[in-house]
């Protein structure tokens, strides 16, 4: 059964090759896409229903139906030590797709010199398992289905 993955935030859908980090751009962690968020306060929501297997101020990993989905808010944002991010849930929580998980402000992160493009990855999946549901360049709202993994 295919797992539908939602955009964790509003923004422009981008190919992973646009992400200026080879770990994501070369799909080393798995296939997916990226979201270039609007500047200003943004709420990152759960892209799938499941268990928050990992949760950091700058990232979330959700286990769902045997799949693991990663949202990484911006790049190299771990060095901010949580500054500019507000975590709304706890590791181990069960969440529903579309539920708010982390509040952040991409404009603050960008002002600090860090990229805000946000990879959305199906961890350790194969590219052949992914069906992208919206074209690169499409502007989506949080909660819009963007790909399926099967």
Predicted regions and their residues:
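Contiguous, well-folded functional domains in the mature portion of proteins
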Residues: 1-150
């Amino acid at each position: 059964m295919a797992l539908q993955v939602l955009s964790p935030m509003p923004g422009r859908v981008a190919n992973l090759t646009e992400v200026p980090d080879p770990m994501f751009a070369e799909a080393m962690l798995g296939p997916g896409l990226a979201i270039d968020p609007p500047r200003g306060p943004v709420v990152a929501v759960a892209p799938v229903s499941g268990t928050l297997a990992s949760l950091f101020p700058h990232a979330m990993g959700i286990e769902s139906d045997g799949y693991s989905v990663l949202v990484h808010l911006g790049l190299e944002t771990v060095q901010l030590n949580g500054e500019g991010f507000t975590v709304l849930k706890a590791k181990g929580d069960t969440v529903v797709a579309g539920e708010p998980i982390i509040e952040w402000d991409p404009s603050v992160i960008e002002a600090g010199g860090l990229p805000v493009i946000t990879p959305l990855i199906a961890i350790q999946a194969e590219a052949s398992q992914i069906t992208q549901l919206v074209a690169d360049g499409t502007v989506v709202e949080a909660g819009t289905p963007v790909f399926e993994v099967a």
